[in-house]
Curated annotation (Swiss-Prot):
InterPro entries: KOW, Rib_uL2_dom2, Ribosomal_uL24, Ribosomal_uL24_CS, Ribosomal_uL24_KOW, Translation_prot_SH3-like_sf
Name assigned to this protein: Large ribosomal subunit protein uL24
Homology family: Belongs to the universal ribosomal protein uL24 family.
Gene: rplX
Membrane recorded as keyword: no
Record's keyword terms, sorted: Ribonucleoprotein, Ribosomal protein, RNA-binding, rRNA-binding
The organism of origin for this protein: Colwellia psychrerythraea (strain 34H / ATCC BAA-681) (Vibrio psychroerythus)
Role this protein plays: One of two assembly initiator proteins, it binds directly to the 5'-end of the 23S rRNA, where it nucleates assembly of the 50S subunit. One of the proteins that surrounds the polypeptide exit tunnel on the outside of the subunit.
Record's subunit section: Part of the 50S ribosomal subunit.
UniProt key word RNA-binding: yes
Any single Gene Ontology cellular-component annotation: ribosome
Gene3D superfamilies hit by this protein: 2.30.30.30
Amino acid sequence: MASKIRRDDEVIILAGKDKGKTGKVTKVLVEDGKVFVEGINLIKKHTKPVPQLQQPGGIVEKEAPLQVSNVAIVNSATGKADRVGFRIEDGKKVRFFKSNNELI
């Protein structure tokens, strides 16, 4: 099944502590319905040092996944959140913005 939100899409956060912020999708977990967005939903992970691998311990900031329902793709023409539709053009399934029928 085709995904409405894919890697490298510009998205806006609709709910949560980062509501209203925009960022680029870095990873999509299709089975879980989650996405990772660059610089959004940062958490602090406490790690122990691993002497065998020369890894220092400490507090590491990393991105946590967001539910795909809490993000919306940003229409580059309007700069606002938009919905995505699918249609067949020249035998290929393509995505388009529902507000202005522009291809993504």
